[in-house]
Amino acid sequence: MRSAQVYRWQIPMDAGVVLRDRRLKTRDGLYVCLREGEREGWGEISPLPGFSQETWEEAQSVLLAWVNNWLAGDCELPQMTSVAFGVSCALAELADTLPQAANYRAAPLCNGDPDDLILKLADMPGEKVAKVKVGLYEAVRDGMVVNLLLEAIPDLHLRLDANRAWTPLKGQQFAKYVNPDYRHRIAFLEEPCKTRDDSRAFARETGIAIAWDESLREPDFAFVAEEGVRAVVIKPTLTGSLEKVREQVQAAHALGLTAVISSSIESSLGLTQLARIAAWLTPDTIPGLDTLDLMQAQQVRRWPGSTLPVVEVDALERLL
C-alpha cells in the first residue's frame, strides 16, 4: 500500500546572501515523503533562484502531479531537474539503494573576512581544503585575499568559484596578485570567465586549473579531457535524477577529472542526502556542502555538529 506526503517550507537566510546580484532572504522548497508498507523515503525539491530553470511554484505543480501518478502505480521520473532529483532520492531511500554512509567533511566556505577562514582551518584535521567565492569584488582584491590565504597556510588547497564573473582582463588582474609559486595549490577555479573559450585561455595563460560548473547544464557540453581543466562541480538539484548525477560522475572519473558533489543551498535534510551521495559516488573527494550556516534553522534531519535549531516535520505546511 502506497502513501505520500508533500510539505512546503521556507527558511530565513542570514543577511548578506546574494545570488546573481539578488539578495536571498528566504530559502523556499518542498519535501516529499513516500511510504510503501513499512518503508519510507524522503526527498527535497528546492530550485535555486537565479540558477534553476524552474521556480518552486512550478516545481510544486510538477511534484504534486507526479505523486498522484506514483500513488496510482506509475514510477516514471519527471523531467524537471529539481523534482527529478528530490523524487529519485525519495525512491532510493524507499528501495534502500542510497547508502547510509555519509561524508560530512565539508570544504569551509569563505564569504567575507579571510581571518575567519584561517581560524576555522587551523582546527581542521587532515587535508586542508577551503572554498572562496571570487568575482564579487574587484579582481585585484580577490587575488590579494587568495594569495594571503595560501601564504598563511602552507598546506592549504583552495577551490575558487567565479561564477563566470570575469572578463579576460579581470582574470589576468586576479592572477597577477597570486604568487606563481602558490598557484599549484589552487585546486581549481570554477568558470572564471563568461565563455568557455575565455576560461580555457585563462587556464593556459596563468597555469591555474579550472573546473566546469554551469557548463555541465548547457546543451552543447561534452565530457572531454582538456588542458587546464581539472574538475567538474556537480550540483544535483540543478542536474536531475540520481542516475544522471551518477552518469556525470562516472564520465568525469573516466577522463581522470575530479568530480565534486556540491550544494545548491539545500536545507539540512537535502545536505545530509548530498553527504551520502558524495560518500557513495566520490569517496575520495571532500564535497562542497558548507552552506548550512547561511540559514537560520535546520529541518527534519540534523547536520552532525550543527547548533542551529531544528524545525520538525509537524511544523511544516502540508500540501498532501
From Swiss-Prot:
Gene3D superfamilies: Enolase-like C-terminal domain, Enolase-like, N-terminal domain. Its EC number is 4.2.1.113. GO terms for molecular function: magnesium ion binding; O-succinylbenzoate synthase activity. Pathway: Quinol/quinone metabolism; 1,4-dihydroxy-2-naphthoate biosynthesis; 1,4-dihydroxy-2-naphthoate from chorismate: step 4/7; Quinol/quinone metabolism; menaquinone biosynthesis. It comes from the Bacteria. Its cofactor is a divalent metal cation. Disulfide bonds: none annotated. The keyword Magnesium applies. Keywords: Lyase, Magnesium, Menaquinone biosynthesis, Metal-binding. InterPro entries: Enolase-like_C_sf (IPR036849), Enolase-like_N (IPR029017), Enolase_C-like (IPR029065), Mandelate_racemase_C (IPR013342), OSB_synthase_MenC1 (IPR010196), OSBS_N (IPR041338). Mg(2+) binds at residues 161, 190, 213. The keyword Cell inner membrane does not apply. The active site is at residues 133, 235. Converts 2-succinyl-6-hydroxy-2,4-cyclohexadiene-1-carboxylate (SHCHC) to 2-succinylbenzoate (OSB). PANTHER family: O-SUCCINYLBENZOATE SYNTHASE, O-SUCCINYLBENZOATE SYNTHASE-RELATED. Belongs to the mandelate racemase/muconate lactonizing enzyme family. MenC type 1 subfamily. This is o-succinylbenzoate synthase.
